[in-house]
Curated annotation (Swiss-Prot):
Site (Part of a proton relay during catalysis): T46, Y109
Protein name per its UniProtKB record: 4-hydroxy-tetrahydrodipicolinate synthase
Class of enzymatic activity (EC top level): lyase
Classification via CDD domains: DHDPS
Length: 293
């Protein structure tokens, strides 16, 4: 049985004008996701600006998402960081709060070697009694998990999934080959159907902050054999997907949400507002697709 099938949202963190977490808005976003068929909510991940949340804020966001979701969909806690002890503590607390599973990005900046990466994920897995999803995004972390590391970790009973965002489809095929037991999820919104052709169960998506139902339907169409319909959706939204990564995530998606009236605030420094040129492009894309709150 899969961890989940479908499109999970890498949920943004909304902020007030004075840069504090806007919990009233966060609850609105959770309700919007549930009403629009999201298959999982990822709390306090990269798109949630976890790197600029304090440890207390991070755990508050995770706890809030679990409490407000009320088991209506899966909640996956983003617990990875570049300090193994902190990642273990985040994972333990998330599990205690009731997270369905935890997802840990590879340690960034300090670039652990193979033994260090194996130790990092092993400690996380040993700290919880729920499934663990590895998250590989080399463009942001500077770390690409070797196939040996992935194979070794896949043999730990509760390391059951990987969110893969390298953009390297041949590497994805290698992962499926060496670790067939892992549930695979696309971490790239522009590669959902190609990765599903190699066995992915779905996507953990940035664009689902705006189009959760469309992404859910795309994945379900593919899983149910309506592959051509899924491909049509992938192609239809490709310009939207590109626009959401015109600058560093989550700045474009938050800008788009603000244009649409979600009023989620700005990103925390060092992520600044979009350039005027890119803001205008995002606005034009929103209008092109007729996207509304």
């Amino acid at each position: 049985m899969s961890l989940f099938e479908g499109a999970g949202v890498a949920l943004i963190t909304p902020f007030t004008e004075d840069n504090q977490i806007n919990y009233e808005k966060l609850e609105e976003l959770i309700e919007f996701q549930i009403a629009n068929k999201t298959d999982a909510i990822i709390a306090a991940g990269t798109t949630a600006e976890s790197a600029t949340l304090t440890p207390e804020e991070r755990m508050q966001v995770i706890k809030f998402c679990i409490e407000r979701t009320k088991k209506r969909t899966i909640v996956i806690a983003g617990t990875g960081t570049n300090n193994t002890a902190s990642a273990v503590e985040f994972s333990k607390k998330s599990y205690e709060y009731g997270a369905d599973m935890v997802m840990a990005v590879t340690p960034y900046y300090n670039k652990g070697n193979e033994s260090g990466l194996i130790d990092y994920y092993t400690q996380i897995a040993n700290s919880v009694k729920c499934p663990v999803i590895m998250y590989s995004v080399p463009s942001r972390t500077g770390v690409k998990l070797s196939l040996n590391v992935i194979k070794t970790l896949s043999e730990i009973s509760n390391i059951q999934g990987i969110k893969e965002a390298s953009g390297d489809i041949s590497y994805v095929a290698d992962i499926v080959n060496v670790a067939p037991k892992l549930d695979l999820y696309s971490g790239n919104d522009d590669m959902v159907t190609p990765m599903m052709a190699l066995g992915a169960k779905g996507v953990i998506s940035v664009t689902s902050n705006i189009i959760p139902k469309e992404n859910h339907d795309m994945v379900m169409n593919f899983l149910n054999g309506n592959v051509n319909e899924a491909i049509k959706t992938q192609i239809k939204y490709i310009d939207f997907v590109r626009a959401m990564f015109i600058e560093t995530n989550p700045a474009p998606i938050k800008e788009a949400m603000n244009i649409m009236g979600f009023n989620v605030g700005e990103c925390r420094s060092p992520l600044g507002p979009l350039s005027e040129k890119n803001r205008e492009h995002v606005k034009n894309i929103i209008n092109k697709y007729g996207l509304k709150k």
